[in-house]
Amino acid sequence: MTLPRQCAAACRTGGGGGGVVRCRAVAAAGGAVAVRDAVVAPVARRGAARKTAETVAGMWREVQGCGDWEGMLEPAPHPVLRGEVARYGELVGACYKAFDLDPASRRYLNCKYGRERMLEEVGMGGAGYEVTRYIYAAADVSVPTMEPSTSGRGRWIGYVAVSTDEMSRRLGRRDVLVSFRGTVTPAEWMANLMSSLEAARLDPCDPRPDVKVESGFLSLYTSADKTCRFGGAGSCREQLLREVSRLVAAYSGGGEDVSVTLAGHSMGSALALLSAYDLAELGLNRAAPVTVFSFGGPRVGNAAFKARCDELGVKALRVTNVHDPITKLPGVFLNEATAGVLRPWRHSCYTHVGVELPLDFFKVGDLASVHDLATYISLLRGADKKQPAAAAADAGGVLAKVMDFVGRRRGGGALPWHDAAMIQMGGLVQTLGLI
């Protein structure tokens, strides 16, 4: 029997009962012995065993990438995997629906709802997760506007949640979820537009100066705003490490199987990957596998960053639209495809991390939504051509508010170069559905 690569003994695809027989395949090479478990069903029970294996609970480790999704993406994504990835996309979409873009609101640029009822308020009360903490991020960049003091202020960037008991039974484990929204504020746009590489230095034992990431993403992840009024004191990194480590310790200490899933769209997928790398450097993935589901995500770091993520066992599934320009950035010219040719600059070449799940938005005839999260989800759900437009309409209110927000930030006494930059950003948002 062929097993997904790198699953090893940790990968379990079925329970111990129901007529399923475990066999142990022992492979020895150069004195090293690797023991792998395979699930073999008796002929008389083959149908029942297959039914068990093709549930989320029966194959959750494969869904989380224990075998690098080998055999699960071609010729078409496995239906269980496709459904799970779409579900995580919807949990990311909740961030957009809950984000407050009303300048008259006291929660302006923060979440509109308290964490106890946020998912219910955005129509996802049955998602099976309980939000345990909100996450805030502040970019350490200056944006000259009428309100320069707000450039580096912390903004609501997403949330941490944990699966309920009922959902955990369906999933086959306790799932700790971190969900990130994409780019909205001017400071975030400026952080996105920064293309220089900077040493991450997130390994507490070794600075690893060769492991570099995009400086804007690193700033969003590590900069702190101690004045944040909604409990976001400390950097995005500090908030996440405290909460995720607390949840993993609480549930794994109780004997449960636990997973850590980080999901994000656009800029949020970059933060998800940075967080996953950080958690793995600190060894948290020894207690719980760490997986990233990225939607329309840009490149984050260089080849050394990718190599270190691979070495640490960080699993990342990149859901991309083959026509989405954001997934080609940064590193339009200096990337994994040109590193071999541009050897003197190979350490400055951006490199994608993980396995790609490509989608083709042209097939739905909706060319204006090349970066739209709703269209990503519709294609994953196997929707027909009429549904992506309807799904995108659900996010239309958010897009309109973003455009209104961008327009207001252009007005007044903004500097000319900033005004031009905001016009370009607004055009990109309107054209590509960047929210």
UniProtKB/Swiss-Prot annotation:
SUPFAM superfamilies assigned to the protein according to its UniProt record, in alphabetical order: alpha/beta-Hydrolases (SSF53474)
Catalytic activity from the UniProt record: a 1,2-diacyl-sn-glycero-3-phosphocholine + H2O = a 2-acyl-sn-glycero-3-phosphocholine + a fatty acid + H(+)
Segment annotated as transit peptide: 1-31
Induction, as annotated: By high temperature.
Subcellular location: Mitochondrion; Plastid, Chloroplast
Cross-referenced InterPro entries: AB_hydrolase_fold, Fungal_lipase-type
Coarse class of the protein's main subcellular location: mitochondrion
Positions occupied by motif GXSXG: 264-268
Enzyme Commission code: 3.1.1.32
One GO MF term attached to the UniProt entry: phospholipase A1 activity
Enzyme class: hydrolase
Keywords from the named record: Chloroplast, Hydrolase, Lipid degradation, Lipid metabolism, Mitochondrion, Plastid, Stress response, Transit peptide
Keyword Disulfide bond: no
Tissue specificity: Expressed in roots, shoots, leaves, inflorescence meristem, spikelet meristem and floral organs.
GO CC terms: chloroplast; mitochondrion
UniProt GO BP: floral meristem determinacy; floral organ formation; lipid catabolic process
Pfam families: Lipase_3
Catalytic residues (UniProt): 266, 324, 371
Stated role: Phospholipase that releases free fatty acids from phospholipids. Catalyzes the initial step of jasmonate (JA) biosynthesis. Required for the biosynthesis of endogenous JA in seedling, inflorescence and spikelets. Not essential for JA biosynthesis after wounding. Mediates spikelet development and specification of empty-glume identity. Functions in a high temperature-dependent manner to maintain floral developmental robustness under heat stress conditions. Functions by safeguarding the expression of several floral identity genes, such as MADS1, MADS6 and G1.
Family: Belongs to the AB hydrolase superfamily. Lipase family.
UniProt-recorded name of the protein: Phospholipase A1 EG1, chloroplastic/mitochondrial
